[in-house]
Every structure is written in C-alpha cells, then in structure tokens.
Amino acid sequence: MCAVIGAILLEPTKQDFAMLRRVFLESKIRGMHATGMSFLPKWSDKIEIIKEPIPAHEFIFKHLHDDNLKDMVAEDGNLYMIGHCRYSTSDLEYNQPMFYNEKSIVHNGVITQELPENWKDIYGYDCITKNDSELVLHSNDPLREFSHMSMGVVELHQDRRIRFYRNGKRPLYLSSISNGCIITSTADIAIRSEIPGIPVEVLMNHYITFDNELAMMIEKVDVENAKDLQHYELC
C-alpha cells in the first residue's frame, strides 16, 4: 500500500503551497518508508526528481517550503507535480517517482510476481531496476497490458501534461479546484487535506489527461471481465 499524488496548479499561491504540503502530510498514512516527487522547474524544461528514504513530514520540512516550491513552478507560471509516499515491502532502492523517455510516474500496486531477470522474455522491456513499476513506465497502454494486476498511477509528461488512471484493484480520486486539479489515492486524504470541493473517484479503466490549460481528455479502455473491487460487496 502506497500513496500517489498529482497536481496541476495554475499560478499557485501560498495557500496552494500550504494545501500541497497537507496532501503530502495526509498521504503518509499509506507509506512512511520513503517520499518522492517529480516536477517541471522554472530553470529547466526537463523533469526533476527528488526522492529520499524519509517520511513525508521530514520530506516536507526539507523540500516543500514556499521558497523551494516557487522554484518548482514551471516557466509558464504553473506547477506540475506528482508525488509518492511508499510503504516498503522490499529494498528502498525501489523508491519512486521513476523516469524514462520524457515521462515520470508514481504507481501504487503490483504488476508482476515474476523474477526481474525474466521480465525481458515475458514482457519485452529492458528494465534497469528490479522495481516492477518500471514495467508501467515502459508500457504505452498499461491498463490493457497489465489488466490482471493492480495499479493506481499518475504520470507527469515533459510537455506539461498529467495523465492518471486506475484499474479495479486500486483506488484513485480527483479533486477539481478553481485553478487546477489534485489527484490523491483516497477520498479521505483529499478531505483531511482540506482541498476545496468534493473528491470524485476516478473511473476504472479510463485514461484521464489534463494539459497546461486544464483541458481534460478521457479515453475509455475496454477490459474483458473487469471488476471494480473498490466497490466489492460480500453476498
């Protein structure tokens, strides 16, 4: 169990920065072994990544004060960020976010139980880590390709887009605000973070993308026999 975070904030204010810190702080309940983030800074058109084996409250104190966050605002005046709070079940070298080919991701879930040395033969990807989230990073269509496994994912793209999605085995929520959107793993994280508005559950097996003008694109993925276990009820 981990927490994933996503944010696009147009011309963010100090109040927005405080809200973002609350999101990281409230997300740590789902993982305290490591915290990380990716963002598009004003000094570069490349994605920057910071991740450390520390809980979110220490990460916030070290990296998310207002002066640092101002520098994380992109050249267009907007903030594009994804984050991760990790509950570790293996080596801390597997911390997130991850980056490949102008895309960074944070992932909550399990993609494979196969040994890493077999991934190339099974999935066709040359992975440089033993973190199975890297398979999602390489895939262009993970909802179809790994439909049998579990995922709640937020992607940050260098062209100032955020894409997010889940299958029926992991939760994910979207909160729309006046100047942007916030993605959290659960509704209660959004509520405790005092994000304005009501968190809405992300539709299962849909790719949802926001661009730098908050234009939204939704792509439905047809997956045979898909079930949303977030709403599973015992008979």
Predicted feature descriptions by range:
Residues 1-235:
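Conserved short alpha-helical segments that host acidic/polar catalytic motifs at enzyme active sites
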